[in-house]
Amino acid sequence: WQGEPVFPNWKGYVDDTLAMNHMYTFVGYAGQGTLCVEPEAGVTGFNLFVNNRQINTAAMAAGGVWNVDISGQTINGRNTIQVGGIRPRGKKVTVRVGYPTVQEGSLQDVGIDRDALELLEQIVQADVNNGFPSAQMAIVKNGKLVYQNAWGKVNSYNPDGTPKTDSPAVTNDTLYDLASNTKMYTANYALQYLVTQGKANLDSRLVDLLGSAFVEDTIDITYNGYENPGLKVNKQWKAELTLRDILRHQAGFPADPQYHNDSFDQCAQKTVPGATNVLFSGWDGSAATRAATLKSIFKTPLMYKPGTKTVYSDVDYMLLAFAIEAITGKGLDAFLKETFWDPMGLTHTTYNPLLNGFAANDCAATELNGNTRDGAISFTGVRTATIQGQVHDEKCYYAMGGISGHAGLFSNATELAKLASVMLTGGYGENRYFSRNVMDAFTAPKKEDAANWGLGWWREGDNQRCWYFGTQAPSNTIGHQGWTGTLTMIDPVENLVVVYLTNKINSPVTDKAANPNNFNGNWYTASTLGFVAQLLYQGLQNHGTDPNNAYSALLEDMAESKFALVAEGGSVPATHPLVRSGYAVLEAMAAHANSTHSYMDRNYFNDALTLLDDTRDAEELAKLKKMLNKF
């Protein structure tokens, strides 16, 4: 329950503010809510108000339990219950308040302009038409699921990079590899719950949770270019590490020590053919290898003095997974399933989908040639086939058996939006997950000069995360991103959750010699994540005016910006994904003009065609001219 106040004097004493003794505030949304009212035996009458609206209590007999529908009285945000006039004096009335749940709704219900979403759809679809793999999106506002959509195929390319023609379409049920969004909705959620329950303390030391080996087994590694204070000092540093340090990404661990890679040079922090990885734990993903990985983390010396810098490290959240398992005595996946997923009815949220009832085509595929970056990378045991239904992240798959705090979770946009909505309310239905104090502690700026970080959570701050959350998001907007192309955004001011999932790395590597981590999918507007929030807020902020002129002007400006990027790319052919993404913006402009039947949009479109190169883009120019309908 969100609260179980016993009136009067629900705080347990008579407060001299007087009014407080009879009022209790809860978080709710308009159009939903139920109170469970239980008058004590002997009560002959009492008053009940919700947001100053009186509820008829005449039929609520003493000693009974009464479910009261308050959906007609609730508002979005803070709601107030008032209970008083209890007779005879000295008797009590208990009121139990549940948490809001996510219910079906529409964009119109919550004041989001449909045209803004149509513009977004035109951009994503045009990108998909020009080579972007797939995307999926869900929006929850004011406790209502108001938008779901999906674009593209579950697996868009063959291993040789040619388009795959026999792949099924993505649906709203398709599971995506969430990559680092896993961090928030597994390790952070688990710790927020455990701290709320009093079962964990953020200032608990890791050595006390995991045993003395966390410190004593540390070995000496000379990291190139780092302080390297010596083994004795390094052990002293590790001995004082707390959960809070880990959550801040300021614990001192290297970003990516690759415990699974037998030829990874820990001093150089890169793969060196013929090198021996002194922290190698295994690559088969077995339970034994997962246990060995914990021992490898124990051996890992810190790279810098804790608290002196922020280094985003997957090791931090691998370690948190083990800490949570030590606190709960359960596997991380089992704990999350029984605590969150099952009570919330989340049937498409899981680790290791192929081991939990899902088929490969239930999942959006990621890399085309295993973890090889199209043949640029090799290590013992590396996967070479297209990854689908298995976690892409190497450390999670090879070293952690697919179950970790840093990666491994799969879900779809709709279920993840429901899960993320808990950060707006603290619970779901009759399930209390996080206290307000705990949510505030985890989402507040971790330091005065680091407003873009909470404890694990990414924060908008002063436009410091606008590439992800847009420029209109308030400073306390939180969320995360994932390397596979995933975004979650939670805006507590607007009671808004946006989940946008892509599998942008389900595409060829653009130039594996220049950068084996840059996939074709990275070049498209649909991969930039923040454009979603930017357009959505446009649809929230029209203030009763017709926003279409602004949308049309913005679309041409986006085209100009895209072709400025094309120009920066130098002499690139028409087949390059950067150029294809430019074509996609122009095709979105054509689709927009066709939908609005506006001569202004036609003029914007024709003006944008001058951005094309007469020679390189001749074929596309002819195609675009045919796309514009006559009206």
Q: What are the residue ranges of the model-derived segments?
A:
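Short strand-turn-strand beta-turns centered on an Asx-Gly dipeptide
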Residues: 47-57, 142-143
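A short acidic/small-residue loop/turn micro-motif
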Residues: 56-63, 152-159, 504-507
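Short active-site loop at a secondary-structure junction
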Residues: 65, 130-138, 157-246, 303-316, ...
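Catalytic loop of the DD-peptidase/beta-lactamase superfamily, centered on the K-T-G motif
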Residues: 72, 86-153, 165, 308, ...
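Residue-level detector of alpha-helical secondary structure
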Residues: 583-590, 606-609, 613, 621, ...
